[in-house]
């Protein structure tokens, strides 16, 4: 099965797909061109399917592809040096969100985790724009 070159070298294309796939996992909805969205769809579907497996190998493969990006910062209780309870900020990363939040949501679903909605042409160059989102 072929793929789109997206007018870039292979390393640039891989970086673009990594960035867009990570952004889709973090925000669960992004706006991009139609060609890019169709390529991201392939990547994200495979990432979510491996996230559903949840084993160490799947986690390492996903970690090799997804950017190490902070999704949010949550406060957790932790023990201080004197034994008291203190609040600490702990970051939640994109990989953690994929395995703990996104993948379990689709446990009963056999593929088709994304939806592409056509938006219309971009004003500057007329490129067909779409919104890709997690179902």
Swiss-Prot record:
Q: Which UniProt keywords apply?
A: Ribonucleoprotein, Ribosomal protein
The record, for InterPro entries, names: Ribosomal_bL17, Ribosomal_bL17_CS, Ribosomal_bL17_sf
Q: Name one GO biological process term.
A: translation
The record's Gene Ontology cellular component field reads: cytosolic large ribosomal subunit
Annotated GO MF terms: structural constituent of ribosome
Superkingdom, according to UniProt? Bacteria
Q: Entry's Pfam families?
A: Ribosomal_L17
What is the similarity comment for this entry? Belongs to the bacterial ribosomal protein bL17 family.
Q: How does it assemble?
A: Part of the 50S ribosomal subunit. Contacts protein L32.
Q: Which NCBIfam families match?
A: L17 (TIGR00059)
Q: What is this protein called?
A: Large ribosomal subunit protein bL17
């Amino acid at each position: 099965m072929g793929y789109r070159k997206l007018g870039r070298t292979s390393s640039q294309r891989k970086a673009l797909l990594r960035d867009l796939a990570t952004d889709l996992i973090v925000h669960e909805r992004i706006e991009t061109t139609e060609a890019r969205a169709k390529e991201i769809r392939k990547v994200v579907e495979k990432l979510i399917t491996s996230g559903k497996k949840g084993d160490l190998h799947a986690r390492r493969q996903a970690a090799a592809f997804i950017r190490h990006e902070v999704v949010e910062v949550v406060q957790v209780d932790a023990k201080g040096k004197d034994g008291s309870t203190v609040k600490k900020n702990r970051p939640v990363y994109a990989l953690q969100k994929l395995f703990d939040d996104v993948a379990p949501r689709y446990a009963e679903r056999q593929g088709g985790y994304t939806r592409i909605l056509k938006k219309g042409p971009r004003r500057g160059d007329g490129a067909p724009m779409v919104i890709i989102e997690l179902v």
